[in-house]
């Protein structure tokens, strides 16, 4: 099975050298790789294949999500092929980004993980700069690069220090290891390491790059940003908690408070957004704040809840960005003040908006509800005083979801809207691919909650 996976990963490079039908090749091979990923998930709880590749439930769950989202990105970006907007270059970029992300999730080596973690920045910037919408995309790329690099360089220094002190860079070796470092040094190392991941997440106060990047990115860029790239930060935090578990317990109250206050603040910011993509981007900050608060509780229940939230948010936020792109093609605007009457113009699209808006606000039977219940209980177990912030977060999340839905679908129809809505089979397939795992995983939740 491992050999089959390696062969298929190598075959994914074919679109780089084949001139004909690059979309079909990448789509087919990505679909073939997905069942391989699930078969490996059902193997041992932790398996180390080589010095540079290992797996457990979290890494393979996120790898499967990466492949699934990549397939949907290709389906959502067929306009690039039809308009001949450098389709081969686009496919090459997507395949490179896919390989980087899978290597990042499967790497047990701390230094290699950092290299793949940073390498994901390059294809993302190429996506925004080459296929972005507005001239401001250069500013968005600059924000993304400066925030990520500025936070990651101190983290690299800490990782090198860990390697020198422990004489190993293998993350599984950190589980029961005692480091000969005093408390202030460990505290500084934890803060610098956490900073690099919190910017990628991003957490409130270091989130300004995210709305800019989402607004200027093409549909494929928004999907991969929301569904996968933000999860690199959460994945890194969960991995490093095995090394800094004592420091995490001593700082969890402060950091969780900041994360929950940020979740409430970004939910309030969502209520006054007029740009649809910006609203969805800010909602991601709120959900990731709740996720990091649960992860920092350092309990098995919190770890499982954080992973469940990453999977649930990856599917729902990707779907919201796909539908935002469909709305833009119908109305030629992203403004919630101008985007009115879609219930009359596109009732099928309205149905999909209702389903995924409900999923985003954690309504049953979505896995978002499961993840939020698990996160709230894990946080309240450690600190009952957090129930006020958790209640406000849940309330304002529902409020901005209803505001987003009613602003677009009710009211008089815009005169500038496309009179013949084009809801194609491709769009129906895309939305179904988002909805099916969101609903079905609730019947087998151990797929996303059995890691600890």
Swiss-Prot record:
Domain of life, per lineage: Eukaryota
Record-annotated membrane-spanning stretches: 7-27, 57-77, 95-115, 116-136, 145-165, 186-206, 218-238, 251-271, 278-298, 303-323, 336-356, 360-380, 386-406, 428-448
Location(s), subcellular: Mitochondrion membrane
One MF annotation (Gene Ontology) recorded for this entry: ubiquinone binding
Keyword Transmembrane helix: yes
Primary localization class, coarse: mitochondrion
Pfam families documented for this protein: Oxidored_q5_N (PF01059), Proton_antipo_M (PF00361)
Keywords attached to this entry: Electron transport, Membrane, Mitochondrion, NAD, Respiratory chain, Translocase, Transmembrane, Transmembrane helix, Transport, Ubiquinone
Catalytic activity: a ubiquinone + NADH + 5 H(+)(in) = a ubiquinol + NAD(+) + 4 H(+)(out)
GO CC annotation: mitochondrial membrane
Class in the EC hierarchy, top level: translocase
Membrane topology term: Multi-pass membrane protein
Function statement: Core subunit of the mitochondrial membrane respiratory chain NADH dehydrogenase (Complex I) that is believed to belong to the minimal assembly required for catalysis. Complex I functions in the transfer of electrons from NADH to the respiratory chain. The immediate electron acceptor for the enzyme is believed to be ubiquinone.
Family per similarity comment: Belongs to the complex I subunit 4 family.
Protein name, as recorded: NADH-ubiquinone oxidoreductase chain 4
Organism: Lumbricus terrestris
Lineage of the species this protein comes from: Eukaryota, Metazoa, Spiralia, Lophotrochozoa, Annelida
